[in-house]
Amino acid sequence: MNLASISQSYMSHNENERSIVPYIPPPYHPTAPALAVSASQMETMSLGILNQAMSSSAGASGALKDEKAAFGAMAEALRDPEPIRKIKRQVGIQTLKALKVELSGMRRKRLILKIIMFICANVTMATSLVGGISIVDEDIAKHLAFDGKGDWVSKTVHGLNLLCTTMLLAANKISEKVREEIARTKRDIAKRQSYVSAATMSWDGDSVTPLRDVKYGD
């Protein structure tokens, strides 16, 4: 082999090496996920709280139902991402003010209905008593209904009895609806207060510092 062929072979080898651009991978710095443990703990806690909220509430009192609703709201807060949790917290604080105002108005409305029911019940009892006595005593019956001049008294007594009985039944029905609305509003307040409390918890590893003095719609 002469020098010319050796030189040509060397030059072709160098050209092949220059035609291939070597790939240099970027530097890799292994890092462990910082929030993997706490996220897993929050999911586990969320499932446990949700299990408490989904348990049977048959025969439970209103306070226990409010408690289960609060459990469900806390489980929802633990599942939500941090930005959504902050948004819901701000909206919940504003909604709580309106709900408390509505709750005060409904309580005043129910108090007025109770006063009306008390008055109507007393008038109904009094007019029924007068009507019963007029049936037993003939003199009172003659004075109230059968002597011509006193007929208006009997009509007034029976009219008051019918009117107050009707008002009593209507007020009782409205009062029951208001009572159900109060229970629903208190439960909504409990849910939002629990969500706000869970959203304001400070998480530090395995320890949790909750917001104290949580009230359930009172």
Curated annotation (Swiss-Prot):
It holds the Pfam family Orbi_NS3. It comes from the Viruses. InterPro entries: Orbi_NS3 (IPR002565). May play a role in the release of virions from infected cells. Belongs to the orbivirus NS3 family. This is Non-structural protein NS3. It comes from African horse sickness virus 2 (AHSV-2). The lineage of its organism: Viruses, Riboviria, Orthornavirae, Duplornaviricota, Resentoviricetes.
